[in-house]
UniProtKB/Swiss-Prot annotation:
This is Methylenomycin A resistance protein. The chain crosses the membrane at residues 28-48, 65-85, 93-113, 123-143, 152-172, 173-193, 212-232, 240-260, 285-305, 314-334, 346-366, 371-391, 416-436, 439-459. Keywords: Antibiotic resistance, Cell membrane, Membrane, Plasmid, Transmembrane, Transmembrane helix, Transport. The keyword Transmembrane applies. Its main location: membrane. The lineage of its organism: Bacteria, Bacillati, Actinomycetota, Actinomycetes, Kitasatosporales. Resistance to the epoxide antibiotic methylenomycin A; probably by mediating its efflux.
Amino acid sequence: MTTVRTGGAQTAEVPAGGRRDVPSGVKITALATGFVMATLDVTVVNVAGATIQESLDTTLTQLTWIVDGYVLTFASLLMLAGGLANRIGAKTVYLWGMGVFFLASLACALAPTAETLIAARLVQGAGAALFMPSSLSLLVFSFPEKRQRTRMLGLWSAIVATSSGLGPTVGGLMVSAFGWESIFLLNLPIGAIGMAMTYRYIAATESRATRLAVPGHLLWIVALAAVSFALIEGPQLGWTAGPVLTAYAVAVTAAALLALREHRVTNPVMPWQLFRGPGFTGANLVGFLFNFALFGSTFMLGLYFQHARGATPFQAGLELLPMTIFFPVANIVYARISARFSNGTLLTAFLLLAGAASLSMVTITASTPYWVVAVAVGVANIGAGIISPGMTAALVDAAGPENANVAGSVLNANRQIGSLVGIAAMGVVLHSTSDWDHGAAISFLAVGLAYLLGGLSAWRLIARPERRSAVTAAT
């Protein structure tokens, strides 16, 4: 392995054997495998939820922990993982994360009880937190030219979206044929291929002497964990129960201490200087609302089809396929239209489209024709397929390639917090309503409003500043 100067402040290592002419498709495949595994482990668990409930005799609260426990450690550790990537190198942290995720997936498959599965899912989330921001950083440095990078972001998102779209169907088939354990064993060959390709073909980025804000990260973790406990356990224990009120108090205290610390130290958890730019703030706000809506609705639909409509896991996966397959198709379309329209314009238009489609389902009942549900959710996912790469491109444009590690960590953290809150909120709705139809209707209302708020945020913080910049440049 030899080290070469790649320009600016970074260096890169030439892959083993001195090869530097690695095809773009090979690089994208290597860097997408981590995201594929992380995405699969949300979508396939949603379809397997009812089977896991029956097999391990879990409550709805425990099932929510199985899904959200993964997202909790994922969101909690993303910022710390971004700092580690800066300190010891993105490639090293990416491979570490893949290894942890690989072993945790095996532990999930072997889990004999709900408690053991929850613990393994927590470790899985930690592994995902390590490789997610490093994946974006490695992609940015692998494709330094902006136009090519934008195309590669679209292709990268399409690969991930395809796995997300096929995840419910593949997961349902595997659960029906081999049991719920098989959805975690699926990660083993994917992880092995991804680690081998990354080690062989992806060049390393330069490490930087960075102080890790460990006390701040610990407060961040405590605050998120306490909020998660209150949201997930509240419906079962009661919102005024001692443990729930204590969790809220711990969350508020940890958040207050974190805020005080952030204003007094030179190495804060959040890169607050980046939030001075409206594009960076807008991309992160859109990321939170987008994941709240997308993963909250996916969690709800996986259970709704099985409990309210009597579908098997495989049938539920097939029923979700026409709705989710639009997501990767739209990702590919984004790669073609991104040169004609600004990211802010695309985000605004397609967030509003997704919101309108979701709100059209607030009258859903068990007798609503399947094709009506499929069309509405499918249209929403057309919007989602544009939104995902669009927000990432807007973020990179706002932060600059030199801040890719930390910017990717912030965006992914906000997105996963959105997933965490969205899944927990849908769990609260389904636990608190009198029947599945009522729960689904309220869920679609929340999802639609989240998309619409995201659209307004994209217009105000991304699209309008882009137009002002374009006018200024023209004059």
